[in-house]
Amino acid sequence: MSLYDDLGVETSDSKTEGWSKNFKLLQSQLQVKKAALTQAKSQRTKQSTVLAPVIDLKRGGSSDDRQIADTPPHVAAGLKDPVPSGFSAGEVLIPLADEYDPMFPNDYEKVVKRQREERQRQRELERQKEIEEREKRRKDRHEASGFSRRPDPDSDEDEDYERERRKRSMGGAAIAPPTSLVEKDKELPRDFPYEEDSRPRSQSSKAAIPPPVYEEPDRPRSPTGPSNSFLANMGGTVAHKIMQKYGFREGQGLGKHEQGLSTALSVEKTSKRGGKIIVGDATEKGEAQDASKKSDSNPLTEILKCPTKVVLLRNMVGAGEVDEDLEVETKEECEKYGKVGKCVIFEIPGAPDDEAVRIFLEFERVESAIKAVVDLNGRYFGGRVVKACFYNLDKFRVLDLAEQV
């Protein structure tokens, strides 16, 4: 028997009416939500043509699946199959493969290095192009490039030509005459006046036979020339024999009245495979003129008696050939002798072509100026022979540049 058995307990549904209404409302809401979920699921199953979404397994997909598996069925269904509001139901979101990840290394350093190398390569190409353009302008202005003891073109051919000329002048081995000349020599009559002279005295002798002496003092003769030069130009005893058969005697000209050549012709080389024939007398005259010119010019010992810091270069370019690059190129070329303080180009109007343009170089040391004069005097520049000497330092500083040297 309980404590309150004697009390009457009224049982009525009015006190529980509010709770039952709320419960019924909850049940109705759950049913509506369940119906919406089932309807959406049925629509997705009908769209069989849509591809399944791609899942990136490397990005912790297992933890997401495990989380979804632990959730209730209706919540898991909502998480697995969300329908975005901004996309249609048929679109599928695929994550990008190259999505930026700050923890993952990239190619930034390689790209920067490649761009730096490309810029450096472009600068090198531009510098090389500028050098080539400068060399091209220099070659267009001068026939020979830079300072040189002799012109650059055909230097190898000139050396070969000089070597062959020295061999001929040394009187080397004689070339055997053709058999036709030997047979004619044997068939000559006994009374032929030059038969004995045409035959060599000995087989081992390579020098030419001296001409016969005649006892005719009144006979006019041309002045005798140097014997060694003729024999060297004639190429030895064979050519001498052939000329003697036609009546040639040393010091006399060919022909009946001796008006022909008294010395052999020679060839002067003009190009790689070309040349011109010059008379031996003209060659000897030209050599004599060259020797006289060399003797007239001031020797280097006279130039070096009064050295200064200023060097004067003449005959580098002719009148009207001065351009804007000449000063820079000359200064750069002379930097190898020592530091050049100043380079001045002065042109004298009305002067001869080899004296019109003067180039002054002021070195910081006298030793550098002496090196420049010794090395540059007599060199070729653009087909011209450079004249180098010293100039008064005081007159150079007051710009008195037209003094006679």
UniProtKB/Swiss-Prot annotation:
Domain of life of the organism encoding this protein: Eukaryota
Modified residues (Phosphoserine): S2, S155, S169, S222, S266, S295, S297
Source organism (scientific name): Mus musculus
Cell compartment(s), UniProt: Nucleus
Descriptive protein name: Splicing factor 45
Crosslinked residue numbers (Glycyl lysine isopeptide (Lys-Gly) (interchain with G-Cter in SUMO2)): K15, K24, K33, K41, K58, K256, K276
InterPro entries noted in UniProt: G_patch_dom (IPR000467), Nucleotide-bd_a/b_plait_sf (IPR012677), RBD_domain_sf (IPR035979), RBM17 (IPR040052), RRM_dom (IPR000504), RRM_dom_euk (IPR003954), SPF45_RRM (IPR034653)
GO biological process, one term: RNA splicing, via transesterification reactions
Modified residues (N6-acetyllysine): K21, K41
PANTHER family: SPLICING FACTOR 45, SPLICING FACTOR 45 SPF45
GO cellular component, one term: nucleus
Residues carrying Phosphothreonine: T71, T237
Domain RRM: 310-389
Keyword list, A-Z: Acetylation, Isopeptide bond, mRNA processing, mRNA splicing, Nucleus, Phosphoprotein, RNA-binding, Spliceosome, Ubl conjugation
Single GO MF descriptor: RNA binding
Role summary: Splice factor that binds to the single-stranded 3'AG at the exon/intron border and promotes its utilization in the second catalytic step. Involved in the regulation of alternative splicing and the utilization of cryptic splice sites.
Residue numbers spanned by region Disordered: 57-88, 114-233
Main location: nucleus
Compositional bias per record (Basic and acidic residues), positions renumbered to this chain: 57-68, 114-153, 182-200
Domain G-patch intervals: 235-283
Subunit structure: Binds SXL. Associates with the spliceosome. Interacts with SF3B1, SF1 and U2AF2.
PTM annotation (N-acetylserine): residues: S2
